[in-house]
């Protein structure tokens, strides 16, 4: 009977040890997965910021272009408009 108790305790002890080792590995894997997810999220944010900067840059270029060609699109820049149409603004000395 005593040997049966010893072997039963030994089996239970080894089972608990292996269970705790598996739980530790599972926690480590979850932490690694969280770190990878965090890195992916930060890369996505960086990608979105780069895309937003690119879109803003294009929009500002388009805004400048539309401002230059607002009145007479076939004439060119506003400085050229003033040269050809002095009554629209101050006369340039060019």
From Swiss-Prot:
Bias (Acidic residues) ranges: 30-42
Residue numbers of Methionine amide PTMs: 75, 88
Spans annotated as Disordered: 27-46
Modified residues (Leucine amide): 62
Tissue: Expressed by the skin glands.
Signal peptide: 1-22
Cellular component per GO, a single term: extracellular region
Compartments (UniProt record): Secreted
Keywords: Amidation, Amphibian defense peptide, Antibiotic, Antimicrobial, Secreted, Signal
Keyword Methyltransferase appears in the UniProt entry: no
InterPro entries linked to this entry: Frog_antimicrobial_propeptide
Family the entry assigns: Belongs to the frog skin active peptide (FSAP) family. Brevinin subfamily.
Identification of the protein by name: Preprofallaxidin-9
Natural source organism: Litoria fallax
């Amino acid at each position: 009977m005593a040997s049966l108790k010893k072997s039963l305790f030994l089996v239970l002890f080894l089972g608990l040890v292996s269970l705790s080792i598996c739980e530790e590995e599972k926690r480590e894997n979850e932490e690694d997965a969280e770190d990878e997810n965090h890195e992916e999220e930060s890369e996505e944010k960086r990608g979105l910021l780069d895309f937003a900067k690119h879109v803003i840059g294009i929009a500002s270029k388009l805004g400048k272009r539309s401002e230059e060609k607002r009145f007479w699109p076939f004439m060119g820049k506003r400085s050229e408009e003033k040269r050809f149409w002095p009554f629209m603004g101050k006369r340039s000395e060019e």
